[in-house]
C-alpha cells in the first residue's frame, strides 16, 4: 500500500454498517472452517484458520479503501464483487488447510481440494465483472484481488 493510501486509511472513519458486514462475513467464514475442521481434523482447521485470519486482517486494514478513488466517499457496504472476492479467499484458505496433510481417503475428499481451487479460480474471473456491472469497483476490491492472487499461488 502506498504512503498516500496508508495516510488516507488512517484518517478515514469507517461506517458502522460496513464494519458489521465485514464482521459478519468474517464470522461466517470462521464458522464454515470450524464445520470443515470437525470433518477434516484439527490440523486442517489450524492451517485454513490461519490463512482466513490473515485475509480478514488484510481486509480490515483496507476497509477505508472501499471507494472508487481516493477522493471519492466510502461505499456504505462491501458490494457483491467484494463479497465474491472474500468468498474466493475463503476457498483458497480451505485449500490451504490441505497442505502438509496425508492424502485424503476416499474419492470425494481426494477431489475436494481441486474443486475448491476450481471455485476460487472461477470467482477470480467473476468478481471483476460483477464490480464493473454493478458500478461498484473499488480500490479495496483491487487490493483484495491481488492479496487473493498472491495467497492462491
Label every model-predicted segment.
Residues 1-114:
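Topogenic membrane-insertion module of multi-pass membrane proteins
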Residues 116-153:
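Acidic (Asp/Glu-rich) catalytic motifs at the cytosolic membrane interface
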Amino acid at each position: 500500500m502506498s504512503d498516500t493510501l496508508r495516510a488516507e486509511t488512517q484518517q478515514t472513519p469507517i461506517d458502522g454498517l460496513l464494519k458489521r458486514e465485514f464482521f459478519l462475513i468474517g464470522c461466517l467464514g470462521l464458522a464454515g472452517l470450524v464445520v470443515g475442521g470437525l470433518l477434516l481434523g484439527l490440523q486442517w482447521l489450524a492451517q485454513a484458520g490461519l490463512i482466513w485470519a490473515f485475509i480478514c486482517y488484510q481486509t480490515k486494514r483496507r476497509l477505508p479503501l472501499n471507494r472508487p478513488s481516493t477522493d471519492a466517499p466510502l461505499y456504505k457496504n462491501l458490494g457483491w464483487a467484494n463479497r465474491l472476492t472474500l468468498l474466493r479467499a475463503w476457498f483458497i484458505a480451505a485449500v490451504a488447510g490441505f497442505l502438509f496433510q496425508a492424502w485424503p481417503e476416499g474419492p470425494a475428499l481426494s477431489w475436494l481440494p481441486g474443486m475448491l481451487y476450481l471455485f476460487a479460480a472461477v470467482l477470480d474471473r467473476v468478481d471483476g465483472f460483477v464490480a464493473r456491472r454493478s458500478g461498484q469497483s473499488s480500490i479495496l476490491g483491487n487490493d483484495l484481488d491481488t492479496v487473493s492472487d498472491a495467497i492462491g499461488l
